[in-house]
Amino acid sequence: MGDKYRDPVHGFIEVTDLENEIINSAPFQRLRNVKQLAMTYLVFHGAEHTRFGHSIGVMHLVTRAFDSAVSNGSYSFSDEKYAWYKQLLRLIALTHDLGHAPFSHASEAVFPDGLEHEDFTEKIVKETIIATHIKAIGATFVEKYGPEYDITPELICDIYRGRLPGENSEFTFLKSFMDSELDCDKMDYLLRDSLFCGVKYGNYDIERLLSSLTIYIQDGCPRLAIGSGGTQVFEEFVLARYFMFVQVYFHRTRRFFDIMFSQALKCILPDGTYPQDVNDYLMWDDCRVIQELKAHVDDNDACANIVKRVVYSCANESVTHPKSGDRSPHHFGLCSHHNFER
């Protein structure tokens, strides 16, 4: 039977019963308390949306994108492969952000050495109840189509992280729906972030973009592509991303709070970093971090700045596109209480 989720960006989104088991699991429900845009809500007050809605939205878009590309392209799959590939993509999309730390990318400065949020995602997919639910979905495909159509946590992670051998593998085609200049992750977050930030910069014609997707055959293997009639909407999509980075993601006040947040985390986290154990890691979400920030307001300036929304004055700001050799795409200095920081 399945279920439906009413999404503010895409309308009703359908999920199967087994997919709903993943959504209702504790690791996935944690994403309700992980903001998509970190401290951005202190600048654009509507930006309270979370990784939960984004993950479901990406699953919805990757389904539509795959259907459209295959329908428009000249590369065909068997019915069994078509169903298998689509289910693989839906699971990759649904689980791709499970490893995000509280306040998303703003936390990455305090990850254990050598680890990224993708590493925690892989641990969660393989080592928690998520693995059990994925294997249950795989079992239905084995029963219906045979053992070559099994779906495992390892396969989900390998496709998403590009570890499968063979550059011309059909799995490379699948990966491009989630990691390319035309991926469904970007398609969703641009629209979702624009909506909740109350800006228009990230808007583009999603229907035209999806309907323009096709398959290009290169050396006998499928590649995700845009049809000749979709050139303009693809340009619109690229520009939408550019303007969102300039106007929202690199907003100087938002970047200030990212810096404060990184400093605060080093104070409130045990040993100044998130735990490596996946179960301990999953105990951390935005709510717990906010509680810890409030508990340290009186003994840490960075914590106080976030909780009380104290913003330093901007002393100088570089151009958006720095010359070669600059450390980051956006530099600015902060001035407060006669102290100058760079």
Q: Residue spans of the language-model regions?
A:
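Sequence-structural signature of the catalytic-core scaffold of metal-dependent phosphohydrolases
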Residues: M1-L91, G99-P322
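Short Lys/Arg-enriched alpha/beta "domain-start" segment
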Residues: D326-R342
